[in-house]
Amino acid sequence: MRSGVIAQKLGMTRVFNDGGEHVPVTVLKLDGCQVVAHRTKERNGYTALQLGIGRAKVKNVSKAERGRFAIAEVEPKLKLAEFRVEESDLLPVGAEITADHFVVGQFVDVTGTSIGKGFAGPMKRWNFGGLRATHGVSLSHRSHGSTGGRQDPGKTFKNKKMAGHMGAERVTTLNLKVVQLDIERGLILVEGAVPGVAGGWIQVRDAIKRALPKDAPQPGKYRLANSAAPQPAEADAASDTGAQA
């Protein structure tokens, strides 16, 4: 299992396919997505990569966190996240993952925090039909109605759909197609909508319910901290030492 990436949602636009049809896409940007640390079975009980993205002000970073970034020889990051991987898919600490970590045409799963809507009624939150417009209904047209039984069960069950806080939840959208890549600017264009606000942080992974394309780089595509050119993955050249576990 390859590592995912952390990206920033820039917004939505559209592109045109070969048939002249417009395709709505969401633009995701990789802004210095680097490997900050490893998680190993011997020390942590599982294998994972800790990635960081964005540039944080040093004054806003704790002393302990500054020490961890110094060990990894990377700048302080705004956002950190872990991705479970196989031991053979570990990337070197300090490596910067590039946009061609994914390939055009593959499917990805995108995770983000949905837009908060505040306190919402049952019609907006759960798509309830509401009560009748006339004939005995007064001031309760948008209410949810009864919430339970009579003496039995004598209570309202947990998880009953009612009015409450809507949005601001962790949401994963499955099987979004990668439409275009801009490697120089670190942009990934995926078809359709992505959860979250413009400027929010998004996690992008290989689709769990779709097969990984054969031309997808293994264990990933990245550039080293002191190198301007991306390092070829093992899938591109078996003799290359740039991509290693």
Swiss-Prot record:
Disordered as annotated region, ranges: 214-245
GO biological process per UniProt: translation
SUPFAM superfamilies per UniProt: Translation proteins (SSF50447)
Cross-referenced InterPro entries: Ribosomal_uL3, Ribosomal_uL3_bac/org-type, Ribosomal_uL3_CS, Transl_B-barrel_sf
Domain of life of the native organism: Bacteria
PROSITE patterns listed in its UniProt record: RIBOSOMAL_L3
GO cellular component terms given for this protein: cytosolic large ribosomal subunit
Residue(s) carrying N5-methylglutamine: 151
Composition-biased stretches (Low complexity): 225-245
PTM summary: Methylated by PrmB.
One term of GO molecular function: structural constituent of ribosome
Keyword rRNA-binding carried by entry: yes
Keywords: Methylation, Ribonucleoprotein, Ribosomal protein, RNA-binding, rRNA-binding
Family under the similarity heading: Belongs to the universal ribosomal protein uL3 family.
Free-text function comment from the UniProt entry: One of the primary rRNA binding proteins, it binds directly near the 3'-end of the 23S rRNA, where it nucleates assembly of the 50S subunit.
Quaternary structure annotation from Swiss-Prot or TrEMBL: Part of the 50S ribosomal subunit. Forms a cluster with proteins L14 and L19.
HAMAP family named in the record: Ribosomal_uL3_B (MF_01325_B)
UniProt-recorded name of the protein: Large ribosomal subunit protein uL3
Organism of this sequence: Methylocella silvestris (strain DSM 15510 / CIP 108128 / LMG 27833 / NCIMB 13906 / BL2)
Gene responsible for this protein: rplC
